[in-house]
Design a protein with these regions (language model features):
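Extracellular/periplasmic periplasmic-binding protein-like sensory domains
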Residues: 254-325, 336-337, 342, 390-410
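Short, solvent-exposed amphipathic alpha-helices that sit
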Residues: 60-78, 100, 169-172, 192-211, ...
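Short, low-complexity disordered leader/linker segments with a strong preference
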Residues: 1-46, 408-410
Length: 410
C-alpha cells in the first residue's frame, strides 16, 4: 500500500506541474498578443514621396523633402509613430518629367505598397500622377505643385492639396497692383502652372477693374526671354505681373532690358532665396509671398526655423520647406484621428474639412475640393544690412478667408 500511495503522489505532482506549465505558456501567449509587444507586429504606415531631386525644380524638391521630414518629427514628437504603427517614407525622383513621375508613382504603389502619395514639385508631374491615386485608391497629398486644375478639372476624391494654388496666388498678386484703369501684362512659363496662374490672375485683376493688355508664355526651360520681354515693352503696360518657377528665372534680363526704366513696374510672388538673390533691381517692389521665414509668428514656425538651422548648417527654411512640413503634419493628424487606420475612405472622411496647425498658422482642407485654405503675405522687397538679397518685408498677412479660391471642380 505504501508503494501505491507513493506512486499516486508522484502522479499528482506530475499532473500539477503539467497544468502549471500549460498555464504559464497560456499567460505568455496572451501577453504576446496584446499590450506593448503587439506594437512591434503592426505593419508600418508607408508614404511615397515624389519630388524633383534633379531637373529645373531640384531646389523646390530639396526644400519640400526637408520640410516633410521635419514635419513628421514635429507631429510625432520625434517618434515617427502613430497609434503604435511606425511611419516610413520612400522618396522617388521624378526628374521633373511627367512620364518619369508616372513610372515612379506606379513603383511606389505596386512594389512598395505605400498607403499615401505626396508630391510633386512640378504641376505637370503632379497632374500626370493624379489618376493613379484614384486607380489605386490611395490618398495623395499634393505639395508644392500649385496648378488650379489639381483641385479643379483634374480633381478626384483622393487628392488633398496642402500647397496653395494659382488662384490663391492670383488673389494676393492682384490685391497688390490691380485697380480700375491699370494696364497689366503677364509673363509665365508655358505649361499648366503658368497658364493656370495667369488665368486665375486675370480673373482676379479684372474683378478689381484692371485690363490685361498682353500675355506672354515662355518655354519652361528657356534661358533667353528677349523676345517675350520686347513684346511686353511694346504693349506699354503699367505693370508686368510675373508667374515663374525654377532656377532659369527672367529677372536678370528684365533688368538688362531696363523694363522698369521704361515706366513698367514689375510685380510677382517673392520666390525662394536663390531667386531673391537675382532680384536686386526689384528692391521696392510690392507683391506677395507664400512664405518667408521671418513672417509667420507662431510656435511651429519658431520650431521649424530653429530646428532647420540646427540640422542644416545654419540655413533657414526656404519657400517650400513649410509646405513639406504642413503636408506631413496633415497626414499625421489624420492618422491620429483614425487611430492609425490608413483606409482611404476613412481618411477621406476624416480629412474633409479638417483643420491643422502649420508653420503658416491654421490650414483647413475645404470639404468641397480638398484645397487647403491658408494665409499668404503681402510684402515689399527691401534691402537689409547683412542680408545678401532683397528681403520680403510684411505689409500685411492675407487671411485664409481673403485668399480662398473659387471652387472649380464642379
Amino acid at each position: 500500500m505504501k508503494g501505491y500511495h507513493g506512486k499516486l503522489a508522484l502522479l499528482g505532482l506530475l499532473i500539477f506541474m503539467m497544468v502549471f506549465a500549460s498555464a504559464c505558456s497560456s499567460d505568455k501567449s496572451s501577453s504576446d498578443s496584446k499590450g506593448g509587444t503587439s506594437t512591434d507586429k503592426k505593419e508600418p504606415i508607408k508614404i511615397g514621396v515624389l519630388a524633383s531631386k534633379t531637373g529645373a525644380l531640384e531646389a523646390y524638391g530639396k526644400q519640400t523633402l526637408r520640410g516633410f521630414e521635419l514635419g513628421l518629427d514635429y507631429a510625432t514628437d520625434g517618434k515617427r509613430e502613430v497609434a503604435g504603427r511606425k511611419i516610413e517614407f520612400i522618396v522617388e525622383d521624378t526628374e521633373t518629367k511627367p512620364e518619369v513621375a508616372v513610372q515612379k508613382a506606379t513603383k511606389l504603389l505596386e512594389e512598395d505598397n505605400v498607403d499615401f502619395l505626396v508630391g510633386s514639385s512640378s504641376s505637370a508631374d503632379t497632374l500626370a500622377v493624379l489618376p493613379l491615386a484614384e486607380e489605386y485608391q490611395k490618398v495623395m497629398v499634393v505639395e508644392p505643385a500649385a496648378a488650379d486644375s489639381i483641385t479643379g478639372s483634374e480633381f478626384n476624391k483622393y487628392i488633398f492639396h496642402s500647397a496653395r494654388n494659382s488662384s490663391q496666388d492670383a488673389v494676393a498678386g492682384a490685391a497688390a497692383i490691380a485697380k480700375k484703369g491699370v494696364k497689366i501684362a503677364t509673363l509665365a512659363p508655358d505649361y499648366s502652372f503658368g497658364r493656370d496662374g495667369v488665368a486665375a490672375f486675370k480673373e482676379a485683376a479684372k474683378k478689381l477693374g484692371a485690363e490685361i493688355v498682353k500675355e506672354e508664355y515662355a518655354d519652361p526651360a528657356a534661358t533667353d526671354f528677349t523676345s517675350n520681354i520686347q513684346k511686353i515693352i511694346d504693349a506699354k503696360p503699367d505693370y508686368l505681373f510675373v508667374v515663374w518657377a525654377g532656377a532659369n528665372s527672367p529677372w536678370k534680363q528684365l533688368s538688362d532690358m531696363k523694363v522698369q526704366e521704361k515706366g513698367i513696374k514689375i510685380s510677382t510672388g517673392a520666390p525662394d532665396i536663390a531667386a531673391l538673390s537675382t532680384m536686386e533691381p526689384l528692391i521696392g517692389m510690392e507683391g506677395f509671398t507664400v512664405y518667408y521665414h521671418d513672417l509667420p509668428k507662431n510656435k511651429i514656425n519658431a520650431w521649424l526655423v530653429a530646428e532647420h538651422k540646427k540640422r542644416f548648417n545654419g540655413d533657414v527654411p526656404d519657400l517650400f520647406t513649410p509646405g513639406g512640413m504642413s503636408a506631413a503634419i496633415s497626414i499625421v493628424e489624420a492618422l491620429k484621428k483614425t487611430n492609425g487606420n490608413a483606409d482611404a475612405d476613412k481618411l477621406i472622411t476624416t480629412m474633409e474639412g479638417m483643420s491643422f496647425e502649420t508653420p503658416k498658422g491654421k490650414m483647413t482642407y475645404r470639404k468641397e475640393d480638398h484645397q487647403a485654405l491658408q494665409s499668404l503675405y503681402a510684402i515689399k522687397l527691401e534691402k537689409k544690412d547683412g542680408v545678401p538679397y532683397p528681403v520680403p518685408v510684411l505689409i500685411r498677412e492675407l487671411t485664409p478667408e481673403e485668399t480662398a479660391p473659387p471652387i472649380r471642380n464642379k
